[in-house]
Design a protein with these regions (language model features):
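Hydrophobic ligand-binding cavity/cleft-lining segments
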Residues: 1-40
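A generic structural micro-feature
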Residues: 2-4, 47, 61-65, 98-102, ...
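Short, surface-exposed coil-to-beta transition loops
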Residues: 5-7, 40-42, 64-69, 102-106
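A short, structured loop/turn motif at beta-sheet edges
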Residues: 16-17, 46-48, 72-80, 109-119
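Hydrophobic pocket/interface hotspot
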Residues: 19, 29, 53, 71, ...
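Short, highly charged C-terminal tails/helix-capping segments
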Residues: 42, 154-159
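Glycine-rich portal/gate segments that line the openings of hydrophobic small-molecule binding cavities
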Residues: 42-90
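Beta-strand/loop substructures that line and gate deep hydrophobic ligand-binding cavities in soluble
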Residues: 81-83, 91-142
Length: 159
């Protein structure tokens, strides 16, 4: 891990194949991508290198944010890498456009954790300390942590 990275890990109470499905299906992503009470009414995913990754989040306070990224790597059932610095087809996004004011690259990995559980790891790589700090102040650990917990709930299904 580099100095400018944010890292989040969770052990989810769902098998890896179900976590993968929940992470890669737009209909499932809409259920967990934004920390409640925020919502994700829109999600588009072309799950291949160079493919588009688009989400739109809304909140009760009038918050409305959309972001377009680009998938860099997809390893079925194991790993997804995407960046906010690029849009569909590897086209650069403008700084601040779809980047939350700073570009980052996310690496999400899934590993079997035994007993039908999954080790979920998300790394947000930033270009410098200022961008990492901005992301931290936006609530990286709280927000991404809540979303990881929600991902686990969606993957596990109704109890």
């Amino acid at each position: 891990m580099a100095d400018h990275d944010q890292v989040l890990e969770r052990t989810l109470d769902a098998p890896r194949d179900l976590v993968w499905r929940a992470w890669t299906s737009p209909e499932h992503v809409k259920k967990w991508w934004a920390p409640r009470p925020y919502q994700t009414p829109e999600c588009e995913m072309d799950l291949r290198p160079g493919g588009k990754f688009y989400t739109r989040m809304t909140g009760p306070d009038g918050f409305d944010f959309s972001g377009t990224g680009c998938f860099l790597e997809v390893v079925e059932g194991e790993r997804v890498v995407w960046t906010s610095a690029l849009g569909e087809g590897w086209r650069p996004n403008e700084t601040g456009e779809d980047c939350g004011g700073f570009p980052f690259t996310a690496i999400v990995t899934l590993e079997d954790a035994g007993e039908g559980r999954t080790l979920y790891r998300a790394v947000a790589m930033h270009r410098n300390e200022a961008d990492r700090e901005t992301h931290a102040k936006m609530g990286f650990h709280e927000g991404w942590g809540t979303c990881a917990d929600q991902l686990g709930e969606v993957a596990a299904g109704p109890k």
